[in-house]
């Protein structure tokens, strides 16, 4: 049983600026409407503590493990509910340069026996959370570019 969410947004800022906003976990409370807090060390194998507040959904705290960190390009973590195979999801942020702008691809693939029961919530609340985070990240990165120009 699996299901995926994929979103993308173009940002009028260099990838280095977008990356700096994305990996400044301590500032999430200042701008991020979806992952309202995040704490931990950014290194492959390290565990984070994230608090999600999906629009219209139930808030939750989870402890994903960073599975990929490519400086300036990719941040991916694996979250799971309890034991493997119940409800697992690699959550991925990938930055690509596009003609002086940055494309953020924000996605998650969900696996496990609970996925069929969670699909409606994923397609509504979680997807809206991804989109809200993307828009807020764009706003914050573009504001940084404006203040340094």
Predicted regions and their residues:
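Secreted/surface-exposed cysteine- and glycine-rich disulfide frameworks
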Residues: 45-50
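A conserved amphipathic terminal alpha-helix motif
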Residues: 103, 109-149
